[in-house]
């Protein structure tokens, strides 16, 4: 993910987080069939998500850090939780979006980020 975002331009946290999410989804798209199988498995065996949760949490923290979003303290914890919720919502949309351009996923992500951006305490 860091490699794909090495030339990420400084802009608003919302725009940067959008770019980070889309870079992540582009990577996942390369392994779409396997990721979809993993999501299907985890939905049937949610207890196994606990085994990969530490790596998932680190990934969310990395996404926030790259986007210049605070990850320390109470506000940082709230930011991490919001990004996790966004991630689950977007993965659900991505899983159903069969278009090559991921247009539906991009639109949904932008709408969610816009709504969260309106909340002054987030990000």
Report residues per predicted region.
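Hydrophobic alpha-helical connector segments
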Residues: 3-37, 44
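Residue-level recognition of alpha-helical structural elements
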Residues: 10-13, 17, 45-49, 72-79, ...
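Solvent-exposed interaction surfaces and binding hotspots enriched for charged
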Residues: 11, 32, 49, 60, ...
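Amphipathic alpha-helix face/heptad-repeat signature
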Residues: 17, 24, 52-55, 79, ...
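C-terminal peripheral helix-coil segments that are non-catalytic and often amphipathic
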Residues: 65, 96-123
